[in-house]
Amino acid sequence: MTEDIRLVIITGMSGAGKTVAMQSFEDLGYFCIDNMPPSLLPKFWDLVRESGKLSKIALVIDLRSRAFYDEIVRMLNDVAVHGTMNAQVLFLDASDAELVSRYKETRRSHPLARNGRVLEGISRERELLAPIRQAAQLVIDTTKLSPRKLREEIFHNYETETTQAFHIELMSFGFKYGLPIDADIVMDVRFLPNPYYLPELRNQTGMDQPVYDYVMNQPQTEEFYQRFLGLLTTIVPGYKQEGKSSLTIAIGCTGGQHRSVALTQRLGQALGNTYPVHVTHRDIEKRKESANRS
């Protein structure tokens, strides 16, 4: 149903932060398209409704396509004022001085500038977009916003319980197979007693209850678990506040079969009460694969 599709059209002044905005919407799970020709939007909207496969869409439409200016203004006005396509218009703005400064820093030319005069292009663009700015559902002034602060502002306005951007990737692994290169935090649990040396547990993994119980019933395991969980509870909010969209925590033992798997499972349950958590066990099948090859 159309009511179930959330469409955000990102527009505004050139240099005001539309690229950062689009990247932020991508992290919120939106399907994003940059600089779509306005003539294609009605057809695209029909395809979206017919397919039913997309529920969150963000489009950047601005005056870079100068040849389509009349279409752009008419389309944005229809969306903002008349509510066509069940869309919301997000308008990004900044002061003339800040926009000039940003253009000087990047050494790019303004799309509406004549003879390279940036301020002239900004003035013309501001005049042309004035009706859209007035009718937009949300205007964000980025003059004093860093990219991270703009990202936070967009999250504040568009993040919902079902589209939470921040999530935790929790991974077990075996040191003998190498460190996970994408991990933000790596914890070595090879100091814990190893179930591998118990014949009845050797061919099981931390996913099996006997191994899980053996690992968790060790006195040092409980003390370590509580301390490590306390550390994560303290530092994870800081990672989120700094603008990370995901945090990868890797827990390693020798082969990635027993200790790391059991602890990753338990931590996943605990952290999952507060954050979206995805648990993977990178090397849990490695021994089975080796046995099959030999």
Swiss-Prot record:
The keyword ATP-binding applies. The keyword GTP-binding applies. GTP binds at D62, L63, R64, S65. SUPFAM superfamilies: P-loop containing nucleoside triphosphate hydrolases. InterPro entries: P-loop_NTPase, RapZ-like, RapZ-like_N, RapZ_C. Pfam families: PapZ_C, RapZ-like_N. Belongs to the RapZ-like family. Displays ATPase and GTPase activities. This is Nucleotide-binding protein LVIS_0651. It comes from Levilactobacillus brevis (strain ATCC 367 / BCRC 12310 / CIP 105137 / JCM 1170 / LMG 11437 / NCIMB 947 / NCTC 947). The lineage of its organism: Bacteria, Bacillati, Bacillota, Bacilli, Lactobacillales.
